[in-house]
Amino acid sequence: GTGKELVARAIGLSRFIPYEEKTGRFASDFLAAFHPINLSALSETLLESELFGHAKGAFTGALQNRKGYFETCGMHGSVFLDEITETKPEAQVKLLRVLQTRRFQRLGEVQPTRFEGKVIAATNRDLAEEMKAGRFREDFYYRLCANRITTPSLDEILRDSPGELKHLVEFVAGRVAGLDEASALADETCDWINRKLGSDYTWPGNFRELQQCVRNILIHR
């Protein structure tokens, strides 16, 4: 709700201009791969299959070889591990090893594959508390957190900069109704928010709640 994936995409989908040795030119346009995965929605086996890939017959239902996200993201790509604190310590050990060695193995295979991309992780929990409770490994934390970004809640943003509401609503309106309708829809939404919710509203649903406000105004126009 605070826009963790938007921040991750902004980092992961950075444009590069790689040099192509075969042609002796720089690529005219290159967009890095971005693979988001919600760790709270997957079992341990399925998580390993999604990230590492698997060989045919590695487990029941593995009918063919499959590349995982660590392999398909390529040299400039990113794997976004959302809700990283939902992983069990056993899975954290395996992910730690990938970060340390830059290598992994598909399920059912012995030959290691090199990981050349980057890992971006996110959580809405207090990592210090998770480590203190023994649910999150300290060694994994220090290997993972090379750079840390805290995404503020919508309430924090608007308390610091009340004028940002119109800008954020216009952004959401553009995505919901298109650029041609964005300005008018944003004006209607801001007017409704000021009349019905007031300037002291704390937005417990964060950006998802703001998006729903814009959609409701669009539906009832």
Regions found by a protein language model. Name each.
Residues L13-I17, E48, G57, G61, ...:
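Conserved amphipathic alpha-helical interaction elements at protein-protein interfaces in regulatory
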Residues I37, A122, I149:
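Short glycine/serine/threonine-enriched helix-capping/active-site loop
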Residues G1-A32, P36:
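Walker A/P-loop
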Residues K4-A10, A41-G53, L63-R102, G117-A121, ...:
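Conserved AAA+/SF3 P-loop NTPase catalytic/coupling segment centered on the Walker-B
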Residues R25-S28, H35-S43, E83-I84, S153-D155:
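A short hydrophobic beta-strand->loop->alpha-helix junction that borders the nucleotide-binding pocket
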Residues I17-L31, L63-R66, H76, R106-P112:
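Nucleotide second-messenger and two-component phosphorelay signaling modules
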Residues A10, D29-A32, E90, G108-K118, ...:
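Nucleotide-binding/hydrolysis machinery
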